[in-house]
Amino acid sequence: MQHETKMENQSWLKKLARRLGPGHIVNLCFIVVLLFSTLLTWREVVVLEDAYISSQRNHLENVANALDKHLQYNVDKLIFLRNGMREALVAPLDFTSLRDAVTEFEQHRDEHAWQIELNRRRTLSVNGVSDALVSEGNLLSRENESLDNEITAALEVGYLLRLAHNSSSMVEQAMYVSRAGFYVSTQPTLFTRNVPTRYYGYVTQPWFIGHSQRENRHRAVRWFTSQPEHASNTEPQVTVSVPVDSNNYWYGVLGMSIPVRTMQQFLRNAIDKNLDGEYQLYDSKLRFLTSSNPDHPTGNIFDPRELALLAQAMEHDTRGGIRMDSRYVSWERLDHFDGVLVRVHTLSEGVRGDFGSISIALTLLWALFTTMLLISWYVIRRMVSNMYVLQSSLQWQAWHDTLTRLYNRGALFEKARPLAKLCQTHQHPFSVIQVDLDHFKAINDRFGHQAGDRVLSHAAGLISSSLRAQDVAGRVGGEEFCVILPGASLTEAAEVAERIRLKLNEKEMLIAKSTTIRISASLGVSSSEETGDYDFEQLQSLADRRLYLAKQAGRNRVFASDNA
């Protein structure tokens, strides 16, 4: 049983090998190599892409941290000022100058505009409007018991604001704006008549209105983008502000205004000059503030669709990246600014960078390897194909007679034995025909060997055309042929032999110019039906004996028995 399984496996492998062929195997091997090389290259591309994304995020994080650090410093100053203001509201300093300031306020509070100054070199002036103007505002009110304390606290904060404000700071203006109709600012109001306009410019700004107890329930620091309160100045500003509360009462707002141009300059200074890419700053509503690119100081390179995609991506995380056409956009929310910093890196910038050089080198290596692989495939495929053709030709020549194109003696015997064994296994008859051309030596002697070769070739063609599909014919001697008929009885084999004899004898063939001859053959037939013997050599010997009986009986005959 194990032997049968082994034979079946070998047979299956042989069939597969015949079906595939060496060329198909070469193709398959090269396809596998190409697929694996492409897979490895793709894996390298994925790793390179991850490294590129990490690099983009690291560059963005460095700039964001630098900007955040500077903004945090200003936020910390604002919190410090609010704490000082709260302390001053609860426990004001008992200075004569401060008491005089309260008295002066009581004297001028009904005036349309007023200013209180203690010492211009030490503190800032308090600028205010009348009770009548305050009463017209919805958010404004002087109905609080600590109004005097707020006046003195504003003067104290003015002293701190003067100390905190310097030319190297990002902050252009720091101010305290009270709901009670006055303000303190590091930008002085030169003329009293300008106080109402400036005050109402403050209290109508989003950074003031947005700190009402309804709008800012958590009383936290907030950032706003707005136009300045001065009509002559059209440059947008970013204002950080915080409400001032004490005993659950909202007194006013402390704020610091930072011009966008200042943030733009700081953004440029924070960027490594050797790095490509554009940095853009947006507020919480994705409104463009500034850019590090001098060519787009007030531009926006994103269309509405791209801004919508960016906003959708920002909903799920505080940092990330997204591809937009040929650009890679990375973004990170700032900790101390209600906005987001965006880095835009274009394809051309990426190609010029280190990752671009590596990508180009990787692509060229893959292309070179693939080209060499294809050339190798073509050369080896041609070599294998030529060798296969040569092998097939040599194998054919080893198994066939080149003149008659029939099997030679060795090949015929190799074919006959397994066919005889198969017929014996299935109890089918197995027959053999021996054919010998009559007077062939005379043809050679009279017309030459070339004519003899033509006769042999002509006879082989007629014999082949007379056989069944499963029959096998071969040349076993000079003018002798042998035909194997698996599954044919003695009678059927005799009929085939007679058909061969008639075809050979009926057709004339041209030997030389104006010379034709007619050939004949003597045939002997044997079959396993007679003795039950399936030995091919025995059957061939028996058929050969009957062939010579046919020659002795006068040639051009078929003998299927020793008596006929």
From Swiss-Prot:
Pathway(s) served: Glycan metabolism; bacterial cellulose biosynthesis; Purine metabolism; 3',5'-cyclic di-GMP biosynthesis
Catalytic activity: 2 GTP = 3',3'-c-di-GMP + 2 diphosphate
Transmembrane segments: 20-40, 360-380
Stretches assigned to the GGDEF domain: 428-563
EC number: 2.7.7.65
Entries under InterPro entries matching the protein: CHASE7, Diguanylate_Cyclase, GGDEF_dom, Nucleotide_cyclase, Rev_trsase/Diguanyl_cyclase
UniProt-annotated location(s): Cell inner membrane
Cofactor note: Binds 1 Mg(2+) ion per monomer.
Enzyme class: transferase
GO process terms (BP): cell adhesion involved in single-species biofilm formation; cellulose biosynthetic process; negative regulation of bacterial-type flagellum-dependent cell motility
Keywords, ordered alphabetically: Cell inner membrane, Cell membrane, Cellulose biosynthesis, GTP-binding, Magnesium, Membrane, Metal-binding, Nucleotide-binding, Transferase, Transmembrane, Transmembrane helix
Site entry: Transition state stabilizer: 441
Subunit structure: Homodimer.
Protein name (database record): Probable diguanylate cyclase DgcQ
Gene: dgcQ
